[in-house]
Amino acid sequence: MSNKKGQSPKEESIAKMLICKVHIGTKNLENKMKRYVYTRAKDGVHIINLAKTYEKLQLAARIIVAISNPADVVVVSARPFGSRAVLKFAQYTGAQAIAGRWTPGMLTNQIIQKFTEPRLLIVTDPRTDAQSVKESAYANIPVIALCDSDSPLEHVDIAIPCNNKGKESIALMYWLLAQEVLYLKGVIPRSEPWNVMVDMFLWRDPEQFELKNLANEENTPTAPHLIENQYAAEAPYDEWTKKEEWNDNTNEDWKNPIAAEEW
Protein backbone atom coordinates (compact mmCIF):
# COMPACT_ATOMS: atom_id res chain seq x y z
CA MET A 1 0.00 0.00 0.00
CA SER A 2 1.29 3.44 -0.91
CA ASN A 3 -0.09 6.89 -0.42
CA LYS A 4 -1.01 9.46 -3.04
CA LYS A 5 2.55 10.75 -3.27
CA GLY A 6 3.84 7.31 -4.26
CA GLN A 7 5.59 6.67 -0.95
CA SER A 8 5.76 3.25 0.63
CA PRO A 9 4.46 2.79 4.20
CA LYS A 10 8.05 2.70 5.43
CA GLU A 11 8.98 5.96 3.69
CA GLU A 12 5.81 7.64 4.91
CA SER A 13 6.44 6.56 8.51
CA ILE A 14 10.08 7.69 8.40
CA ALA A 15 9.00 11.06 6.99
CA LYS A 16 6.67 11.52 9.96
CA MET A 17 9.47 10.52 12.31
CA LEU A 18 11.70 13.22 10.86
CA ILE A 19 8.99 15.84 11.37
CA CYS A 20 8.47 14.81 15.01
CA LYS A 21 12.25 14.65 15.65
CA VAL A 22 12.28 10.97 16.50
CA HIS A 23 15.86 10.75 15.20
CA ILE A 24 17.26 13.30 17.68
CA GLY A 25 19.14 11.47 20.43
CA THR A 26 21.25 12.76 23.30
CA LYS A 27 24.89 13.68 23.72
CA ASN A 28 25.46 10.61 25.88
CA LEU A 29 25.64 7.17 24.32
CA GLU A 30 25.03 3.80 25.91
CA ASN A 31 27.41 1.14 24.66
CA LYS A 32 24.61 -1.25 23.67
CA MET A 33 22.82 1.53 21.74
CA LYS A 34 25.69 2.08 19.30
CA ARG A 35 24.14 -0.29 16.76
CA TYR A 36 21.12 2.02 16.44
CA VAL A 37 23.07 5.28 16.00
CA TYR A 38 23.55 6.52 12.45
CA THR A 39 26.01 9.34 13.11
CA ARG A 40 26.99 12.07 15.53
CA ALA A 41 26.27 15.73 14.81
CA LYS A 42 28.76 18.55 15.25
CA ASP A 43 27.13 19.64 18.50
CA GLY A 44 27.63 16.15 19.95
CA VAL A 45 24.03 14.94 19.60
CA HIS A 46 23.71 11.38 18.34
CA ILE A 47 21.40 10.79 15.37
CA ILE A 48 19.31 7.62 15.49
CA ASN A 49 18.95 5.38 12.43
CA LEU A 50 15.23 5.58 11.63
CA ALA A 51 15.36 2.54 9.36
CA LYS A 52 16.16 0.40 12.38
CA THR A 53 13.51 2.24 14.37
CA TYR A 54 10.90 1.23 11.80
CA GLU A 55 12.09 -2.40 11.83
CA LYS A 56 11.89 -2.64 15.61
CA LEU A 57 8.47 -0.99 15.54
CA GLN A 58 7.18 -3.68 13.19
CA LEU A 59 8.66 -6.41 15.38
CA ALA A 60 7.09 -4.95 18.53
CA ALA A 61 3.67 -4.78 16.85
CA ARG A 62 3.86 -8.45 15.88
CA ILE A 63 4.71 -9.42 19.45
CA ILE A 64 1.75 -7.44 20.78
CA VAL A 65 -0.63 -9.07 18.29
CA ALA A 66 0.64 -12.53 19.25
CA ILE A 67 -0.92 -12.11 22.71
CA SER A 68 -4.49 -13.36 22.48
CA ASN A 69 -5.92 -11.20 25.27
CA PRO A 70 -5.09 -7.48 24.76
CA ALA A 71 -5.67 -6.83 28.47
CA ASP A 72 -2.56 -8.90 29.23
CA VAL A 73 -0.45 -6.07 27.76
CA VAL A 74 0.49 -3.30 30.19
CA VAL A 75 1.84 0.00 28.85
CA VAL A 76 3.61 2.27 31.34
CA SER A 77 4.77 5.88 31.35
CA ALA A 78 6.08 7.65 34.42
CA ARG A 79 7.13 10.56 32.20
CA PRO A 80 4.35 13.20 31.95
CA PHE A 81 4.86 13.65 28.20
CA GLY A 82 3.88 10.02 27.64
CA SER A 83 0.83 9.85 29.90
CA ARG A 84 -1.71 10.80 27.25
CA ALA A 85 -0.01 8.62 24.64
CA VAL A 86 -0.20 5.43 26.72
CA LEU A 87 -3.83 6.12 27.62
CA LYS A 88 -4.77 6.53 23.96
CA PHE A 89 -2.74 3.47 22.99
CA ALA A 90 -4.62 1.42 25.57
CA GLN A 91 -7.93 2.85 24.39
CA TYR A 92 -7.47 1.74 20.78
CA THR A 93 -5.66 -1.57 21.39
CA GLY A 94 -7.38 -2.81 24.54
CA ALA A 95 -4.23 -2.84 26.68
CA GLN A 96 -3.92 -1.66 30.28
CA ALA A 97 -2.37 1.78 30.80
CA ILE A 98 -0.50 2.95 33.87
CA ALA A 99 0.24 6.67 33.55
CA GLY A 100 2.11 8.40 36.34
CA ARG A 101 3.75 6.90 39.39
CA TRP A 102 4.36 3.17 39.38
CA THR A 103 3.29 1.48 42.60
CA PRO A 104 6.18 -0.72 43.78
CA GLY A 105 5.29 -4.38 43.92
CA MET A 106 2.60 -4.38 41.24
CA LEU A 107 4.28 -7.32 39.52
CA THR A 108 5.86 -9.04 42.53
CA ASN A 109 3.77 -8.41 45.65
CA GLN A 110 0.53 -10.40 45.57
CA ILE A 111 -0.77 -8.78 48.76
CA ILE A 112 -1.30 -5.29 47.32
CA GLN A 113 -4.58 -4.44 45.63
CA LYS A 114 -2.98 -3.31 42.35
CA PHE A 115 -1.14 -6.59 41.79
CA THR A 116 -1.27 -7.67 38.14
CA GLU A 117 0.20 -10.48 36.06
CA PRO A 118 0.63 -9.24 32.48
CA ARG A 119 2.23 -11.21 29.68
CA LEU A 120 3.95 -8.18 28.14
CA LEU A 121 5.20 -4.84 29.45
CA ILE A 122 5.70 -1.72 27.30
CA VAL A 123 7.59 1.18 28.87
CA THR A 124 8.19 4.70 27.59
CA ASP A 125 11.65 5.12 29.13
CA PRO A 126 13.75 2.35 30.75
CA ARG A 127 15.34 4.95 33.00
CA THR A 128 12.25 6.67 34.40
CA ASP A 129 10.32 3.38 34.39
CA ALA A 130 13.20 1.44 35.96
CA GLN A 131 11.07 0.07 38.81
CA SER A 132 8.60 -1.61 36.47
CA VAL A 133 11.41 -2.99 34.29
CA LYS A 134 13.17 -4.43 37.33
CA GLU A 135 10.00 -6.09 38.60
CA SER A 136 9.30 -7.57 35.17
CA ALA A 137 12.69 -9.30 35.31
CA TYR A 138 11.71 -10.93 38.62
CA ALA A 139 8.36 -12.06 37.19
CA ASN A 140 9.86 -13.23 33.86
CA ILE A 141 7.78 -10.76 31.81
CA PRO A 142 9.16 -9.60 28.43
CA VAL A 143 9.71 -5.86 28.04
CA ILE A 144 9.37 -3.58 25.01
CA ALA A 145 10.89 -0.14 25.58
CA LEU A 146 11.29 3.15 23.73
CA CYS A 147 15.04 3.67 24.10
CA ASP A 148 17.07 6.82 23.51
CA SER A 149 20.79 6.84 22.81
CA ASP A 150 21.55 6.98 26.55
CA SER A 151 18.93 4.45 27.73
CA PRO A 152 20.10 1.37 29.65
CA LEU A 153 19.09 -1.90 27.98
CA GLU A 154 19.27 -4.09 31.06
CA HIS A 155 16.20 -6.39 31.27
CA VAL A 156 14.89 -4.91 27.98
CA ASP A 157 13.96 -7.55 25.39
CA ILE A 158 12.89 -5.34 22.46
CA ALA A 159 14.42 -1.85 22.22
CA ILE A 160 12.78 0.62 19.84
CA PRO A 161 15.42 3.33 19.23
CA CYS A 162 13.83 6.77 19.26
CA ASN A 163 13.68 10.09 21.05
CA ASN A 164 11.78 9.20 24.22
CA LYS A 165 11.98 12.68 25.77
CA GLY A 166 10.04 14.86 23.31
CA LYS A 167 6.26 14.92 23.50
CA GLU A 168 5.87 14.90 19.70
CA SER A 169 8.20 11.93 19.34
CA ILE A 170 6.50 9.90 22.08
CA ALA A 171 3.05 10.62 20.64
CA LEU A 172 4.08 9.56 17.13
CA MET A 173 5.77 6.34 18.28
CA TYR A 174 2.70 5.16 20.18
CA TRP A 175 0.48 6.25 17.29
CA LEU A 176 2.53 4.24 14.78
CA LEU A 177 2.61 1.25 17.12
CA ALA A 178 -1.15 1.34 17.66
CA GLN A 179 -1.76 1.75 13.93
CA GLU A 180 0.39 -1.27 13.07
CA VAL A 181 -1.33 -3.37 15.75
CA LEU A 182 -4.74 -2.51 14.31
CA TYR A 183 -3.49 -3.30 10.80
CA LEU A 184 -2.23 -6.73 11.85
CA LYS A 185 -5.44 -7.52 13.72
CA GLY A 186 -7.53 -6.56 10.71
CA VAL A 187 -9.44 -3.86 12.55
CA ILE A 188 -8.58 -1.33 9.86
CA PRO A 189 -7.55 -2.23 6.27
CA ARG A 190 -4.09 -1.30 5.05
CA SER A 191 -5.60 0.23 1.93
CA GLU A 192 -7.07 3.05 4.03
CA PRO A 193 -5.25 5.46 6.35
CA TRP A 194 -6.12 5.48 10.03
CA ASN A 195 -8.67 8.22 10.71
CA VAL A 196 -7.18 9.01 14.16
CA MET A 197 -4.80 11.96 14.15
CA VAL A 198 -1.42 11.95 15.88
CA ASP A 199 -2.57 15.00 17.85
CA MET A 200 -4.88 12.75 19.88
CA PHE A 201 -1.78 11.11 21.39
CA LEU A 202 -0.02 14.41 22.04
CA TRP A 203 0.41 15.56 25.63
CA ARG A 204 -1.23 18.88 26.52
CA ASP A 205 -0.52 21.06 29.52
CA PRO A 206 -3.79 21.76 31.39
CA GLU A 207 -2.40 25.02 32.77
CA GLN A 208 -1.96 26.37 29.24
CA PHE A 209 -5.62 25.62 28.50
CA GLU A 210 -6.71 27.53 31.61
CA LEU A 211 -4.56 30.53 30.72
CA LYS A 212 -5.86 30.46 27.15
CA ASN A 213 -9.48 30.37 28.31
CA LEU A 214 -8.88 33.28 30.70
CA ALA A 215 -7.26 35.30 27.91
CA ASN A 216 -10.21 34.61 25.61
CA GLU A 217 -12.67 35.73 28.27
CA GLU A 218 -10.77 38.96 28.84
CA ASN A 219 -10.51 39.72 25.13
CA THR A 220 -14.18 38.99 24.41
CA PRO A 221 -15.92 42.37 23.77
CA THR A 222 -19.27 43.04 25.42
CA ALA A 223 -22.04 44.33 23.14
CA PRO A 224 -23.05 47.96 23.98
CA HIS A 225 -26.77 47.24 23.63
CA LEU A 226 -26.50 44.52 26.26
CA ILE A 227 -25.03 47.00 28.71
CA GLU A 228 -27.79 49.54 27.98
CA ASN A 229 -30.52 46.95 28.39
CA GLN A 230 -28.96 45.80 31.62
CA TYR A 231 -29.20 49.26 33.15
CA ALA A 232 -32.59 49.94 31.55
CA ALA A 233 -34.04 46.80 33.07
CA GLU A 234 -33.27 47.92 36.59
CA ALA A 235 -36.38 49.12 38.38
CA PRO A 236 -36.05 52.57 40.02
CA TYR A 237 -36.12 52.73 43.76
CA ASP A 238 -39.51 53.82 45.15
CA GLU A 239 -38.04 56.02 47.82
CA TRP A 240 -36.22 58.07 45.17
CA THR A 241 -39.48 58.94 43.36
CA LYS A 242 -41.33 60.22 46.40
CA LYS A 243 -41.02 63.98 46.13
CA GLU A 244 -42.90 64.60 49.34
CA GLU A 245 -40.02 63.23 51.35
CA TRP A 246 -37.81 66.01 50.01
CA ASN A 247 -40.29 68.90 49.82
CA ASP A 248 -43.43 68.46 51.94
CA ASN A 249 -42.07 66.66 54.96
CA THR A 250 -39.34 69.16 55.72
CA ASN A 251 -38.74 69.65 59.43
CA GLU A 252 -40.23 73.03 60.39
CA ASP A 253 -37.90 73.42 63.37
CA TRP A 254 -35.03 74.20 61.06
CA LYS A 255 -36.93 77.09 59.47
CA ASN A 256 -37.40 79.11 62.72
CA PRO A 257 -34.33 80.70 64.26
CA ILE A 258 -33.34 79.55 67.74
CA ALA A 259 -34.12 82.06 70.49
CA ALA A 260 -31.26 83.54 72.40
CA GLU A 261 -32.76 82.34 75.71
CA GLU A 262 -32.23 78.73 74.69
CA TRP A 263 -28.47 79.22 74.44
UniProtKB/Swiss-Prot annotation:
The biological processes this protein is annotated with in GO are: cytoplasmic translation; ribosomal small subunit assembly; translation
Give one Pfam hit by family name. Answer: Ribosomal_S2
Give the residues annotated as coiled coil: none
Which key words tag this protein in UniProt?
Answer: Cytoplasm, Ribonucleoprotein, Ribosomal protein
Single GO cellular component annotation?
A: cytosolic small ribosomal subunit
Q: Which SUPFAM superfamilies match?
A: Ribosomal protein S2
Q: Which domain of life is it from?
A: Eukaryota
In alphabetical order, the GO MF annotations are:
structural constituent of ribosome
Keyword set includes Ubl conjugation: no
> Which family is annotated?
Belongs to the universal ribosomal protein uS2 family.
The protein, known as: Small ribosomal subunit protein uS2
Q: Which organism is it from?
A: Plasmodium falciparum (isolate 3D7)
